[in-house]
């Protein structure tokens, strides 16, 4: 079983060019599936039937996995089994037609603009603080995913045109604008970056000189949020959602926000760009000709 998995991981890395972060997620899900199978006496992928797939989902749910995590696990397994069909290791995909439990619409909380200002109001001259502020400014300015920020190299940022080139899901490249404050923060970081003795072209490096890992970026964001007195837990997803919400509040151009976020499906953007009812009411009162009070 492990031999087939390793070939699949090589395929994802070389042929599909998935990021290390995404590849790690695939490994995590398929390792959990493999452990469940071996614990129940299944030693080959040829023994996996639709009933076995349903059993995996049921056991995963018993173990405490929520709907979104179950959907991710099923998706990873289904794609791997489809690969085995193409490789003629299986005749049919036993996960075809099986659905994960229906997910409710999850509306992530956003950070309001006042809190964003508080978050980024730090002019420390410490090199690590300069780096962390540049990461936060860039992520909020361009709505980057954690994996996209992690994968940035020096040549991905064009200082003249104020653009950043990112590799999104499915190796889709997109060019994004960078705001003036984010650009200034990146320039400040580039002036001190060499003090970290960087070992490669990664834009953001650790104190040891290597590319910052996704987990290290998350940890630095958590620490920064606490240090700046943020009233909510800070994570990359929340910052990206805040970017989307604030962009929609300012422009109401859902298609433009979809392009900036790199979503292939507009429905995904609609979930990200949830607007609170008070904002909608304010916009309505100001814009609708029959909503204004008579003077």
Curated annotation (Swiss-Prot):
Keyword rRNA-binding carried by entry: no
- Where's it found, cell-wise? Cytoplasm
Superkingdom, according to UniProt? Bacteria
Q: Which UniProt keywords apply?
A: Cell cycle, Cell division, Chromosome partition, Cytoplasm, DNA integration, DNA recombination, DNA-binding
Residue ranges annotated as coiled coil are none
Domain Tyr recombinase, residue spans: 106-285
Biological process (GO), any one = chromosome segregation
GO molecular function: any one? tyrosine-based site-specific recombinase activity
- Which Pfam families does UniProt cross-reference here? Phage_int_SAM_1, Phage_integrase
Q: Which residues form the active site?
A: 145, 169, 237, 240, 263, 272 (o-(3'-phospho-dna)-tyrosine intermediate)
Give start and end of each Core-binding (CB) domain: 1-85
Q: Does the keyword Cell division apply?
A: yes
Q: Which GO terms describe its cellular component?
A: cytoplasm
The role this protein plays is: Site-specific tyrosine recombinase, which acts by catalyzing the cutting and rejoining of the recombining DNA molecules. The XerC-XerD complex is essential to convert dimers of the bacterial chromosome into monomers to permit their segregation at cell division. It also contributes to the segregational stability of plasmids.
As for family, the record states: Belongs to the 'phage' integrase family. XerC subfamily.
NCBIfam families referenced in this protein's UniProt entry, alphabetically = PRK00283.1, recomb_XerC
User: Subunit structure, per the record?
Assistant: Forms a cyclic heterotetrameric complex composed of two molecules of XerC and two molecules of XerD.
- Which HAMAP family does the record associate with it? Recomb_XerC_XerD
Q: Which PANTHER family match?
A: PHAGE INTEGRASE-RELATED (PTHR30349), TYROSINE RECOMBINASE XERC (PTHR30349:SF81)
Q: What is this protein called?
A: Tyrosine recombinase XerC
**Gene from which the chain derives:** xerC
